[in-house]
Amino acid sequence: MNFQENYDVIVIGGGHAGVEASLAAARMGSKTLLMTINLNMVAFMPCNPSIGGSAKGIVVREIDALGGEMGRNIDKTYIQMKMLNTGKGPAVRALRAQADKDEYAASMKNTVSDQENLTLRQGMVEELILDDEKQKVIGVRTSTGTQYGAKAVIITTGTALRGEIIIGELKYSSGPNNSLSSIGLADNLREIGFEIGRFKTGTPPRVLASSIDYDKTEIQPGDEAPNHFSFMSSDEDYLKDQIPCWLTYTTENSHTILRDNLHRAPLFSGIVKGVGPRYCPSIEDKITRFADKPRHQLFLEPEGRNTEEVYIGGLSTSMPEDVQFDLVKSIPGLENAKMMRPGYAIEYDVVMPHQLRPTLETKLISGLFTAGQTNGTSGYEEAAGQGLVAGINAALKIQGKPEFILKRSEAYIGVMIDDLVTKGTLEPYRLLTSRAEYRLILRHDNADRRLTEIGRQVGLVSDAQWEHYQAKMAQFDREMKRLNSEKLKPLPDTQEKLGKLGFGPIKDALTGAEFLKRPEVNYDEVIDFIGQAPEVIDRTVIELIETEITYEGYIKKAMDQVDKMHRLEAKRIPKNMDWDKLDSIATEARQKFKKINPETLGQASRISGVNPADISILMVYLEGK
């Protein structure tokens, strides 16, 4: 085969999955090529101008802990930062940043361009080149006929695979934001034999900032107290000059406009055939599914410091443009708003994810990986997490090293990938805290404690990040030791001080840690009694200490459950398993096992339609092997 150039890893698509995949592979020493349709759209945000949010924000922290880039990049380019769910328990707290979308993309492109071992190139890949047995990928062919050799290929094409934009009755071939649609590669994947699904997502109109009457909306400022996505970011660099978002609502008039035009809605007229996201429905879908609700929240989100475009969060629509004009003007604060871009729906092909291994390598073709919306997920963060895992595993495969699989108990990224490859998805998959059975362990504050050592082992965490992490953990250990040794004694002045703070008297001496276990007590109050540490304790260390001590009992119970699951995960299933030999299992279970081909007993137990009796039979069979 005559190749123009040869690479270890080729990544197809420069979105959020593609940049993480290519950076990970290159940083692990693989000669990497990132091919993208348009160099001006590297790490572009075609929909919401934000990073993070419920569950997603924890994913960004996990990416950072493993040595990925998304957290660092948003910490350099945000215009607002806000911690969500602060009134709830630590398991569901998550950070969200409003991004300057142009700055975010430009900064990430610079990072990719400057990365050693990584080549960034514009081009459209139309075909995967396979070996003579059609079992292994050995390269790619572009629309110009140029061929590049590769030991591994990662497809991260987002919504571009046979993408079609829909606005009212208008439907045309396009990727996101009027970029080119990737039709040749979509055809090629079908020809190779992959099962392809068709999904849909959408985006709202953008309006001119200076045409908004903000007096009719509610201001939504960022947090004054510092927070960051990257564990390497400093509180000293926290942005003080933040830009607010604004809250408004749909009205009964808005709903009337939509109801009167539902016959023209592509979602209901049959023009849209792809399956849309359950947790991010269009406004026309909302007023139909939730007809009893008199109004729906809308967030006016600035897209950056140097643009007048404002994103109307919550108003995703593919209604005809004339309907969108009327709809926007029916919203308080937007009566005189000038629409800059109409909302649209986009349909695209997806590789149904049950065809993937937990490494995100395809079962059908060796050396071929897929990540991001190509796998049926929604969201920049979900895409980036998958891209990181695919990039790591592509590099490890080439190096002949053990594969990298995150457990459900280790990361939200592990939960997501296990859900995709074990259960599959029939609609755009979104991460939710409710999907994680061990969410008290998978918190915002402990992502580095969970994953930095793992990232170091695979060769992705830098020396600087590793030293920073070790210093933090050493301080954590020292202060935990102090809290478990220093005591509050039942002396008169202690009892008086407790009374003034609203606490009852103590009968016996308590360690600082025992006192902190009380749900109404915080770290600063403990310090009032036992004194300051001989060093300045980092804010993030204090946060970790408070959670670990206050929820110690619950965390221990969760860890006991994790140990039970790990015993199931340790029981491997042979790759060439003959499922027909299991005569006693239910027919549905046998069919699911054949389709998914689970790799461990634990994975088999999580397949929908498989009951405990089937797992018991499988366990007996494996123990007899």
Curated annotation (Swiss-Prot):
Record Pfam families: GIDA, GIDA_C_1st, SAM_GIDA_C
An individual GO BP term: tRNA wobble uridine modification
Principal location class: cytoplasm
Cofactor dependence: FAD
Residues engaged in binding FAD: G13, G14, G15, H16, A17, G18, V125, S182, Q373
Cellular compartment(s): Cytoplasm
Any one Gene Ontology cellular component term annotated for this protein: cytosol
Molecular function GO terms recorded: flavin adenine dinucleotide binding
Family matches, as SUPFAM superfamilies: FAD/NAD(P)-binding domain (SSF51905)
Organism domain of life: Bacteria
Keywords: Cytoplasm, FAD, Flavoprotein, NAD, tRNA processing
Assembly information from the UniProt record: Homodimer. Heterotetramer of two MnmE and two MnmG subunits.
NCBIfam families recorded: mnmG_gidA
Role: NAD-binding protein involved in the addition of a carboxymethylaminomethyl (cmnm) group at the wobble position (U34) of certain tRNAs, forming tRNA-cmnm(5)s(2)U34.
Record protein name field: tRNA uridine 5-carboxymethylaminomethyl modification enzyme MnmG
Annotated source species: Lactococcus lactis subsp. cremoris (strain MG1363)
